[in-house]
Amino acid sequence: MKKMVSVQRLLAALLAVLLLCPMAACKKQADIDQWEAEEKERVYSSLTSGQYYDLDGRYFYLHDTGLYERPIVICFWKMDRPESLNALPAFQKAFERYGGKVQFLMICTYSENDGSGSEDAKQWIEEKGYTFPVFYDRDQILLQRLRVEKLPYILFFGKSNELVHIRNEALSEGEIDTLIADILE
């Protein structure tokens, strides 16, 4: 009799887990959606007024002519953050697949106080064989303005300059493909 009760409890617990797992996944997606909606409002004005630097030290703004001819993916990353570095191979593959349709801005943020700078990042990128375009946020001015707390920090802009998605975690190739499909619509 005790075994029967134990088996019934085990089955009840298993059934509860099976029923709650999809609900938890939905809640996670709902949490992401809510966070993203709040983040979009906060980020948009700060981001479009920011100043960016290319490999040669020339600066530009996101509203510069021609930048919005295609959808844009902006990924903020940092040399001393392993999660940032681990995210870059998936973005390299996405750049290879979508580089003709989507503008990629891979922004390495650094501070000279960190002990690394643009030359360190440039050398590392060359060693890894990355071909996506890299830009720099000197002294983390944009990160501070955006109040970014976790890297990588990724923004997906659609064709009409609309901020469609924001993520603050490393993404798989499949996740990047899905988010890029949204901005290509």
What are these regions (language model features)?
Residues L85-E127, Q140-Q144:
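Structural microenvironment flanking redox-active thiols in thiol-disulfide oxidoreductases
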Residues K122-F157:
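Short, internal strand/loop/helix patches
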Residues A30-D64:
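N-terminal "domain-start" segment that seeds a small globular fold
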Residues K2-L14:
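Bacterial N-terminal signal peptides that target proteins for export
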Residues C21-A25:
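C-terminal motif of bacterial Sec signal peptides marking the signal peptidase cleavage site
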Residues V73-I74, F104, I154:
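Hydrophobic beta-strand anchors of alpha/beta hydrolase catalytic cores
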Residues F156-E185:
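Thiol-/selenol-based redox modules, centered on thioredoxin-like
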Residues Y61-L85:
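Short active-site neighborhood of thiol/selenol oxidoreductases, capturing the structured segment around
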